[in-house]
């Protein structure tokens, strides 16, 4: 289900948080389209944290620590990377309005990024929204092989360690299926979301602020949930 906002409506970071609490999120038709529309899928993509899968080759890459992984150190560069065209993804739904709104959520502590570096070059990463014990993954990018996958592994370890219960991917792609993503009906999703929003919120920075932990430790945390 989609619903377009009027040109005069004002979507603020506070409005955005209320929308996420209701299971709704905004998108744009393209990076050049200034308008947004609200989305509430009939089938929602989630990755069960206890069922997150890491292929053997990727696990070796994670353990090698070939990428320097950081958290919340290059948010604007990460969202810009997600908005940039890539092979197989010539256009994106991330327009300037989206970038500004989520930068506002970042300033409020409700949006986070995980970045993967080679030297001084940002070569991959992801960002998403944290609310209660739910994390809503928004987008990821990479310019080096496996960079965004390594960032995702570190994200999941952080969510598990921080007491999160729900990793919402919004939709399921063939790529995300490799990590255990599944589609669930809206009613089931709403029940999971309500549970994740009740009680004490998750602590995204409990694992470590700034620099991420070694890859081997991230894999240990993930294995402890399975």
UniProtKB/Swiss-Prot annotation:
One of its GO terms (biological process) is protein catabolic process. The keyword Repeat does not apply. One of its GO terms (cellular component) is cytoplasm. The keyword Transferase applies. It catalyses: N-terminal L-lysyl-[protein] + L-leucyl-tRNA(Leu) = N-terminal L-leucyl-L-lysyl-[protein] + tRNA(Leu) + H(+); N-terminal L-arginyl-[protein] + L-leucyl-tRNA(Leu) = N-terminal L-leucyl-L-arginyl-[protein] + tRNA(Leu) + H(+); L-phenylalanyl-tRNA(Phe) + an N-terminal L-alpha-aminoacyl-[protein] = an N-terminal L-phenylalanyl-L-alpha-aminoacyl-[protein] + tRNA(Phe). One of its GO terms (molecular function) is leucyl-tRNA--protein transferase activity. It is found in: Cytoplasm. InterPro entries: Acyl_CoA_acyltransferase, Leu/Phe-tRNA_Trfase, Leu/Phe-tRNA_Trfase_C, Leu/Phe-tRNA_Trfase_N. Keywords: Acyltransferase, Cytoplasm, Transferase. It comes from the Bacteria. Functions in the N-end rule pathway of protein degradation where it conjugates Leu, Phe and, less efficiently, Met from aminoacyl-tRNAs to the N-termini of proteins containing an N-terminal arginine or lysine. This is Leucyl/phenylalanyl-tRNA--protein transferase. It comes from Bradyrhizobium diazoefficiens (strain JCM 10833 / BCRC 13528 / IAM 13628 / NBRC 14792 / USDA 110).
